[in-house]
Amino acid sequence: ADSPGDALDLGVNREALALRGSARWQQAARDADLSFPNGAGQFACALGVAIDAQRTPHLYTLLERSRIDASAATKAAKRRYQRARPFLRNAQAVCTPGDLDDLRQSGSYPSGHSAIGWTWALILSEIAPERADALIARGRNYGESRLVCNVHWQSDVLAGRFMGAATVARLHDDPTFSADLAAARGEIAAARAAGRMPAGDCTAENAVLQVRPASAL
């Protein structure tokens, strides 16, 4: 018999599948892109300033490096558990069909995207505590995009958050990380003073991200 955890995974997956083809599904496809420079902009609306390599170089580099750290933190567990992803069980579409070959070869548990999103949310909340509520919410719904995309189970996403938090805790032992935090804080202050807002439609993004599987944690 399925455990309560399995039942939750299946229930959330059913709710997520109902969002296929919606604006939230399209947002999940955009959230899947971790390549830079696109990845640097995933949290720009939540932060409230534009992020780019030219005008916020320390912040840009901090996000890029921490992406690598958080991704690395999940790889051993993915290899160990080799959990089948939802689309392999339910035979339904994913929001990024071009990634299918890679997804089939990579274990579902834990979610690397969720780990990265949570890492970014925690780091950015330290740099800009006045935006912490929006940033933490973005970290959560960034992971939930993997549910909507039909490539992760709820338990994968939760485990990803744990791995993200562990990644940030380890980074705090690195003096270079602390220096980068301070430099990034100054860049954000300068960007706010200059009125450099995110390029995207943040009102529309925020509205779309309010849509989530009802039972998601």
Residue ranges and their predicted role:
Residues 103-104, 161, 168, 193:
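Alpha-helix boundary/capping detector
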Residues 1-148, 180, 210-214:
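Hydrophobic alpha-helical bundle signature of multipass membrane enzymes
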Residues 172-217:
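Acidic, carboxylate-rich catalytic segments that either coordinate divalent cations
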Residues 82-90, 157-165, 185-188:
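Short alpha-helical linear motifs
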Residues 141-172:
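Interfacial helix-loop-helix junctions of multi-pass membrane proteins
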